[in-house]
Regions:
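Ligand/cofactor-recognition surfaces for anionic moieties
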Residues: 1-445
C-alpha cells in the first residue's frame, strides 16, 4: 500500500518484505474502488454521448505497482464493467468468479480490453487468467446483443473468421482474446523511442508502432502469441480509454512511460477508428473521494498545479544540475503526450515556453548549471511548433530560434574552454540531459 492512501500503519518501512498475496486480488477494498471507478466512467461517457449512452469497448491500461497498492482496483473495474464479481473464501483468497445477474447489474455488459504492462504480466499471471476466464464466461451467456456487448462482438468475430475458413473452435478462442501486452520478456510500448528520436511524421506512425509492440495476447493457454488482427478489432470498437492513478506521489507528467503506454493506446485507437476515443483518468489517490477526469482535464490540472507552480520550480532549482535536468524532462513528456493524445492546449504551451525557455532569469540559471537542459527544452518546443503539435505564435517561434542559437554558442564555448570543461559537469553533454525516468526498464510498472 501507499502511506498517502490511508495506510500510515505500514511505516516505518523495512518490516514487511512482501506487498500482498496475488491470490487475494482483487481484495474487497479494491473491488469497492473498482466498482466506483467503473460507475464514474460510465456516467461520464453517458453525459458526453447522450445519443449512445453505453460504450462498446473500454480500453484499460493496467500497471503492476498501482494494483499492488490498490488491491487490484483496475481488475475489479474490468470485471464489473463486464458484469462479473469475484468470490472470496473466508481466508480472503479469491476462489472464483460469479456472473452478476442483469436485474442487479441494471445496464448492459461492456466489452473491455486491458493493455497490461510487462511487470503486471510477470507478477500477476493469475489475474491475467482471471480476466480471460471472465471474458469467456460473459461471451457464453445467452443474452441479447443490446444487453451483452462483449458477446455480440465475439459472435460477430467468430462469424467473420469462420467465413474465411478458420475452424470454429479456433475462431471462438481467438475472438475472446482481450488481454494484450508486449511479447514475453519484452518491455515498453514502442512510442517513446519514436518521440525521442523524432522518427515519426504523424499520429498514425505512433499508433502503428504501439500496435506492433502491443499485439501479443495473454490468457489461459495463451502466452504472448501475436494477434494483431484481434488487438486491432478491439481498438476499432474502443469508445473509451482509461488509466487509473492511485497516488499523487507521481502523475501522468512525471515520466515518459505514461504517454508511452496510455498516450500510445489513445493514438492507436485514433489511428484505427479514424477519430479519438474519449480518454479518462480515474483518480483514487484518496479512496474516500474517487474522481474521474478527462485526460485533457488531468493534464491541465497538473500543468497548473505543479509544472507551472513557482514553488515547485524553485524547489528543483535548489538541486542545480539535476534539477535543471528534471525541468528539461518536462518537455520530453509534454511533446509525447500532445503528439499521442492532444491534451495540451496552445495557451499552456505558450506559458511553458515563457516560463521555462524565455524567462531571462531562468535562462541565466540554466547557463550556469546545465546549458544542455535549456538546449533540450528549446529544441522540444521548436519541434512541437514545427510539427504543429503546438500552434505557436510566430513571434514566440522567433524568440525560441534566437535562444536556441544563443545556447548552442554557450555550449560550444564551455566545451572548448580547457580551463572549464575538465572541471565542471557543464563542460560535456550528460548521459541523460533530460534527467527523465523510465519506470518500465526499472521494473516499476
Amino acid at each position: 500500500g501507499a502511506p498517502s492512501r490511508g495506510n500510515a500503519h505500514i511505516l516505518p518501512s523495512g518490516r514487511n518484505f512482501f506487498s500482498l498475496d496475488p491470490q487475494t486480488m482483487p481484495t474487497p477494498t479494491g473491488w469497492r474502488e473498482g466498482v466506483e471507478l467503473a460507475d464514474q466512467l460510465l456516467r461520464g461517457y453517458a453525459e458526453a454521448h447522450p445519443d449512445q449512452p453505453w460504450p462498446r469497448t473500454v480500453g484499460v491500461v493496467v500497471w503492476g505497482t498501482p494494483n499492488m497498492r490498490s488491491g487490484g482496483a483496475d481488475i475489479a473495474e474490468i470485471l464489473y464493467l463486464m458484469g462479473v464479481r469475484p468470490v472470496w473464501e473466508s481466508s480472503g483468497l479469491v476462489s472464483g468468479l460469479q456472473i452478476i445477474e442483469p436485474c442487479e447489474l441494471g445496464r448492459p455488459r461492456i466489452d473491455v480490453s486491458p493493455r497490461i504492462s510487462s511487470l503486471f504480466r510477470d507478477a500477476f499471471p493469475n489475474l491475467v487468467e482471471m480476466v480471460d476466464r471472465a471474458v469467456r464466461m460473459v461471451a457464453a451467456l445467452p443474452e441479447p446483443d443490446d444487453d451483452n456487448m462483449l458477446r455480440a462482438h465475439v459472435e460477430a468475430d467468430v462469424a467473420e473468421m469462420t467465413a474465411r475458413g478458420i475452424d470454429v473452435e479456433q475462431a471462438r478462442r481467438r475472438a475472446t482474446l482481450r488481454v494484450f501486452g508486449c511479447p514475453p520478456g519484452g518491455y515498453g510500448a514502442g512510442v517513446e523511442e519514436l518521440i525521442e528520436t523524432k522518427a515519426w511524421q504523424d499520429k498514425a506512425d505512433l499508433g502503428r508502432a504501439y500496435i506492433a509492440a502491443s499485439s501479443h495476447a495473454y490468457g489461459e493457454g495463451v502466452l504472448g502469441q501475436v494477434e494483431t488482427e484481434r488487438f486491432t478489432a478491439s481498438l476499432k470498437r474502443m469508445d473509451v480509454t482509461v488509466k487509473n492513478e492511485d497516488t499523487r506521489e507521481y502523475d501522468m507528467l512525471s515520466c515518459t512511460d505514461f504517454y508511452n503506454y496510455y498516450g500510445g493506446l489513445i493514438a492507436a485507437a485514433t489511428t484505427v477508428r479514424g477519430e479519438a476515443p474519449m480518454s479518462l483518468v480515474g483518480d483514487s489517490s484518496d479512496p474516500t473521494r474517487i474522481a474521474t477526469r478527462t485526460t485533457t482535464e488531468e493534464a491541465r490540472l497538473i500543468l497548473r498545479s505543479r509544472i507551472l507552480n513557482p514553488s515547485w520550480i524553485e524547489g528543483l532549482q535548489r538541486h542545480g544540475y539535476k534539477g535543471a535536468g528534471d525541468l528539461s524532462a518536462v518537455l520530453d513528456i509534454l511533446i509525447g503526450w500532445d503528439a499521442t493524445a492532444d491534451v495540451v492546449d496552445d495557451g499552456l504551451w505558450e506559458r511553458v515556453a515563457r516560463r521555462y525557455a524565455l524567462d531571462p532569469a531562468m535562462q541565466e540559471w540554466f547557463r550556469q548549471v546545465n546549458p544542455h537542459a535549456l538546449h533540450n527544452i528549446v529544441d522540444k518546443l521548436l519541434d512541437a511548433a514545427q510539427r504543429h503539435v503546438w500552434e505557436a505564435n510566430p513571434s514566440t517561434v522567433e524568440e525560441l530560434e534566437n535562444t536556441y542559437a544563443d545556447i548552442e554558442g554557450t555550449i560550444e564555448e564551455v566545451s572548448d574552454d580547457p580551463a572549464i570543461a575538465p572541471n565542471t559537469r557543464v563542460g560535456a553533454p550528460p548521459q541523460n540531459p533530460a534527467g527523465g525516468l523510465d519506470l518500465s526498464e526499472l521494473g516499476l510498472i
